[in-house]
């Protein structure tokens, strides 16, 4: 009976003892052993700025996160983190790491984030990241990498973000990203890239944002981006690009933003933007453009924001296509687009110069009150919500102002047709003048014959006077030479000439004619 009554009391005791033993076994896994100089929060260990020269050995093997930022670690040995199989993120940025041995991250199968930025890494073995099959974010920016092994990122099929900013990369190996099928963000900015391989981005079928700014690219062939079927944003600013081409006909329907600011672009293939039917933001400030063909502008049908300031715009007849397009543009531009040449237009807004100097032939402008211009307190530029974008001025308008200005511009395209039309117009004017003169003469003869007879009689009288004067002069000369002996004019008017051949009597008549 005694044993029967003790058993119910002993069962809870046995359960408590078993639970206590399990807790004791799980203490290491729960992160109770915190390394010296580190701050521990549950299973996350923060050992930043503690002067570590190597990874501390006392780190708990069950930790999920380890931060060793801002220390003095110079080298990562082979199997350095092999026993930390539970790590999901590892931060090693802002150290002095220059050497990473092969398989240094072996065993970190659950690692999702690895930060190695701001170190001195100049080389990475091709097996460095092989076993990081769950890695999603890799940051290698601000190092000294000059080249990458073609198989360096092999096996990283879950990688979504890759930072390679501010290294010394000169080329991108073909098929470097072939196995990165999930990559959505790639930053290759601030390197020394001079050209892009045709298949350099093969495999990046999910890439949405690509950064190539601050490199040394001189020419861009958009056919090299053919395999980036999901790309949304492309940054190419501050390179040395002089022209844009497209080596083949294709449609890049996903691209919505293209930044080409700060290059040396002088020429653009007429069909480049036809491959980007959904492009919404195009920034080409601070280049060397002096004009844009109307075919290029007409292909920008979906554009909502454009940047064209800081170029070498020539405000002559060549600017009419751009002025016409700007006049009907429904979107916005953040900075003024000013003339660069000739001298008398330098510094003038393009649209102001076109109107003020009458640069475009047959220009017509209609101004109506339709839209509202206001100052956005969160931005530096003035938004214009209107049916056109004619620049009225750079005066600051209060947020309460309700000034509404809209212009409708019509600019013909400057081409050979204008010259031909002018020649035809001039020829027609000359022909009209000629026929008009003939018509006036004909009418005069039909309508005013007395006047014409008087004019004719006056002309005949004048001719007779001239003839008589010449006859007198001739006779005077002949009398001095010998045939004439005597000349005696009478008081009545007739005169007699006596010579060796006979006698001639000439009497002056009232109508001034002479009979012999």
Curated annotation (Swiss-Prot):
GO CC, any one term: hippocampal mossy fiber to CA3 synapse
Family named by the database record: Belongs to the LRRTM family.
Residue positions the entry lists as glycosylated: 57, 126, 243, 362
Presence of keyword RNA-binding: no
Name of the protein in question: Leucine-rich repeat transmembrane neuronal protein 2
Pfam families: LRR_8
LRRNT domain sequence ranges: 34-61
GO process terms (BP): long-term synaptic potentiation; negative regulation of receptor internalization; positive regulation of synapse assembly; regulation of postsynaptic density assembly; synapse organization
Segments in the Extracellular topological domain: 34-422
Motif window: Involved in DLG4-binding: 513-516
Signal peptide: 1-33
Spans through the membrane: 423-443
Function: Involved in the development and maintenance of excitatory synapses in the vertebrate nervous system. Regulates surface expression of AMPA receptors and instructs the development of functional glutamate release sites. Acts as a ligand for the presynaptic receptors NRXN1-A and NRXN1-B.
Gene3D superfamilies the record matches: Ribonuclease Inhibitor (3.80.10.10)
Membrane side Cytoplasmic: residue ranges: 444-516
Self-association and partners: Interacts with DLG4. Interacts with neurexin NRXN1; interaction is mediated by heparan sulfate glycan modification on neurexin.
Organism encoding this protein: Homo sapiens (Human)
PROSITE patterns per UniProt: LRR
Comment text on domains: Synaptogenic effects are mediated by the extracellular LRR region.
């Amino acid at each position: 009976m005694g044993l029967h009554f003790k058993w119910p009391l002993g069962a809870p005791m046995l359960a408590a003892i078993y639970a206590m033993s399990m807790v004791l076994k799980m203490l290491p896994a729960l992160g109770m052993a915190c390394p010296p100089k580190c701050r521990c929060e549950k299973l996350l260990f923060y050992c930043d700025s503690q002067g570590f020269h190597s990874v501390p050995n006392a780190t708990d093997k069950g930790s999920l996160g380890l931060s060793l930022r801002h220390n003095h670690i110079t080298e990562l040995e082979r199997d350095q983190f092999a026993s930390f199989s539970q790590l999901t993120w590892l931060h090693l940025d802002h150290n002095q790491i220059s050497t990473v041995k092969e398989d240094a991250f072996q065993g970190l199968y659950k690692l999702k984030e690895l930060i190695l930025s701001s170190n001195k890494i100049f080389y990475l073995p091709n097996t460095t990241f092989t076993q990081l099959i769950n890695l999603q974010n890799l940051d290698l920016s601000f190092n000294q990498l000059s080249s990458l092994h073609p198989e360096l990122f092999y096996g990283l099929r879950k990688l979504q973000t890759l930072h390679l900013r501010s290294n010394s990369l000169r080329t991108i190996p073909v098929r470097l990203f072939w196995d990165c099928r999930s990559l959505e963000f790639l930053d290759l900015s601030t390197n020394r890239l001079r050209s892009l391989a045709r298949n350099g981005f093969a495999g990046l079928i999910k890439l949405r944002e690509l950064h190539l700014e601050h490199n040394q690219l001189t020419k861009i062939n958009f056919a090299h981006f053919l395999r980036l079927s999901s790309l949304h944003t492309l940054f190419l600013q501050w390179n040395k690009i002089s022209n844009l081409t497209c080596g083949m006909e294709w449609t890049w329907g996903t691209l919505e933003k293209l930044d080409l600011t700060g290059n040396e672009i002088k020429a653009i293939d007429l069909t480049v933007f036809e491959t980007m039917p959904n492009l919404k933001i195009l920034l080409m400030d601070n280049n060397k453009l002096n004009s844009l063909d109307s075919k290029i502008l007409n292909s920008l049908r979906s554009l909502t924001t454009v940047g064209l300031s800081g170029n070498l715009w020539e405000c002559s007849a060549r600017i009419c296509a751009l002025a016409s397009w700007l006049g009907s543009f429904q979107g916005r531009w953040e900075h003024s687009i000013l003339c660069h040449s000739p001298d008398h237009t330098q510094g003038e807004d393009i649209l102001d110069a076109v109107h003020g100097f009458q640069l475009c032939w047959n220009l017509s402008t209609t101004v109506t009150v339709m839209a509202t211009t206001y100052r956005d307190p969160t931005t530096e530029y003035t938004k214009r919500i209107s049916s056109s974008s004619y620049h009225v001025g750079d005066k600051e308008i209060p947020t309460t102002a309700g000034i509404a200005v809209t212009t409708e511009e019509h600019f013909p395209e400057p081409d050979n047709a204008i010259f031909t039309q002018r020649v035809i117009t001039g020829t027609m004017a000359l022909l009209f003048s000629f026929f008009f003169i003939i018509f006036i003469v004909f009418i005069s003869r039909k309508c005013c014959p007395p006047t014409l007879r008087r004019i004719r009689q006056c002309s005949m009288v004048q001719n007779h006077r001239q003839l008589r004067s010449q006859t007198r002069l001739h006779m005077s000369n002949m009398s001095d030479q010998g045939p004439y002996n005597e000349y005696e004019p009478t008081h009545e008017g007739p005169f007699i000439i006596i010579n060796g051949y006979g006698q001639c009597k000439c009497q002056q008549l009232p109508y001034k004619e002479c009979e012999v």
